[in-house]
Structure formats: C-alpha cells, structure tokens
Amino acid sequence: MAVISLVNLHYQIEGQVILRNINLEFSKGETFVIMGPSGCGKSTLLRLIMGLIQPTAGWIEIDGTNTNLLSNKDWQLLRRKMGMVFQSAALFDSMNVYDNIAFGLRRGKMAESLIEKRVYEVLSIVGLEPSVAQKMPADLSGGMKKRTAIARAIAFEPPILLYDEPTTGLDPIIADTINDLICELQKRLNITSIVVTHDIISALKVADRIGLLYEANLVEVKERADLKNAEHPLMKAFLKNFELVV
C-alpha cells in the first residue's frame, strides 16, 4: 500500500486552476522530487498533503485514510506523521534553537527530561553541535537555520517528511550539504520524503523518482535511472546541460 495517494486531486482558487486531476502515489522509504517552473502548483501540493488547504475535488489518502473525511482533531493527530521543512525555515525568532525544536514536543505533552534528550539527539543527527541549542535564529547562518528546521521536523520521528525548496537561497556548497543530509535521513530513518524544488542539481542528487508539474498538470514521472528516456520537452530542457550517470 502506498504511504500517500493523490486521487483525481484538483485545486482551484477564484476560478484559476492550480492543480488539475493529479493522480500519484508515494511509497515508503522513497524520495520523490516534484519539479516545475514557478507558479506551477508545487508548493500548493505540499500544503494540500499537510491539510493546510482543502482540495476543490478529489482526495488524498494517507496510510489508507481519506483525509477529506477527517475532523480537525483527527487532522491534528495525522499531522504528527508528517514533518514539514518550509522554504524560509520558519523558525520562531524569539526562541533559541533548543526551544524551536522543543516547541512541538511540548505541545505533544512529552516530559521535559525526554524533550532535552530528543533535542540534542536531533541536533546531532542533522550535524549541529550541542552549543548551537542556545543560539538565536538571528545568529545562525542560512545552512544552520535549514538544519535547525530539519531537526524540528524530525523531532517527532514522523514517517513522512515534506521539503519546500530546501536549498533556495543557499550558496551551492551549503546547498549540496543540505542535499546530502536529505539523502542521509532517508536512508537512516527509512522515511518517505517529498521534495519540491526547481533546481535540477538538487533533484538529481536526492531523487528516487521525479515528477514534473507544468501548467497545473502532472506531465511526467520518471525513475531517476530512467531520466535518459524523458519525453516531455520541459523535462528534457531541465536535463539538457547535465551528463547523467544512469
């Protein structure tokens, strides 16, 4: 059974179609990259999966549950299965790194002694020193902010991670280390990762499969090893200047 299924998923706002009849399944332990030009609906798709907005038509199944049928309380429980890493990192500026990571754990009523253990555990997992816990977001580099956001997202040990443009705004060297971290987490935790990006370099680094969104439609899905057989002109354009080892 797929971990997440999108069934005839359609979303529009004020008459403008953002996503049109998307059918797609995500498997346990895979990293699926969603690519496409700006405004094609990539980030909207993540917001739909998280339940932050509701589909106009169609539905999403998570672990076999039709999310259209969930109450607000049930949605809150389901979201604990998903960690979200936003493009901006979305850290609380008034909290230090420790409290940013601990925030969700405290809302989940975890004992403070266990919270402390978990905070330092996830800091280690994402490659941050324990001393970073006392730093404020304003004192962090872009890469450190992103690692903190990832640490917060995995603190609850969710089986699903959603990344919205995780390397945007980072220099190429730092971006590459974040891509390495995404790969490491997928292997270490056997999680299902969905990564939205417009960067073909990042996509090729982390993806098991790549889906291309264009003008509200899912126009192509390819295994990483089968990209040499891409058919859609836009996918070919993304790949044109890269030598693929497949």
Please give the residue ranges for each predicted region.
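Helix-to-loop junction immediately C-terminal to a conserved catalytic motif
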Residues: 50
